[in-house]
Amino acid sequence: MTDDLVIIDASVAIKAILPNPLQKHCLALVQTFVEVQPAAPALWVYETTSAISKAVHFDQLTENEGRQALEQVDALGMQIFVPDIDQNRSAFDWTRRLKRASAYDSFYLALAQTLDCDFWTADKRLFNALKDARLEWLHWVEELAPLNN
């Protein structure tokens, strides 16, 4: 298992920034990024920007706060991987295994599997869909103690 890389999905980044019940757990994970390099497939950039734009659109954030959130996301220093055909095939296989119509989550799974590293999510639906698979490299953010401010 690769210990210097960790895959995080967009839900972790967004829930670390926007107020929600998992924020302190996500912030605890973000604190570990001094020890490990966070990484994600290229769609992470689109998903985080879209979530922040949606928060501004629905008045959860002001436009200025949205711009600050984009800066916070950028400051995470994510290593972005552009999927190749092997990643596409692996994502397709994960999508079929999960019995889903879209492959977004599957690209995170495929990347973690390919790079042989841990994958952290704050997406309960995704985590629950794979809980019975007992994937040692799949982690739910509440496994970490919340960050106390």
Segments (PLM) and residue ranges:
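Acidic, PIN/NYN-like endoribonuclease modules and their adjacent C-terminal/linker elements
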Residues: 1-5, 97, 109-149
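Active-site-proximal, substrate-binding regions of enzyme catalytic domains
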Residues: 43, 49-79, 88-91
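Short, well-structured N-terminal submotif of metal-dependent ribonuclease cores
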Residues: 1-43, 55, 60-67, 147-148
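Structured helix-beta-strand junction loops
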Residues: 33-36, 76, 115
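Amphipathic alpha-helical segments within well-ordered protein domains
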Residues: 30, 49, 53, 92-95, ...
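Phosphate- and divalent-cation-binding pockets in alpha/beta enzyme and binding domains
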Residues: 25, 47, 90, 128-129
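Active-site neighborhoods of divalent-metal-dependent phosphate/nucleic-acid chemistry enzymes
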Residues: 78-122
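Alpha-helix capping/helix-boundary segments
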Residues: 12-13, 44, 87, 107-108, ...
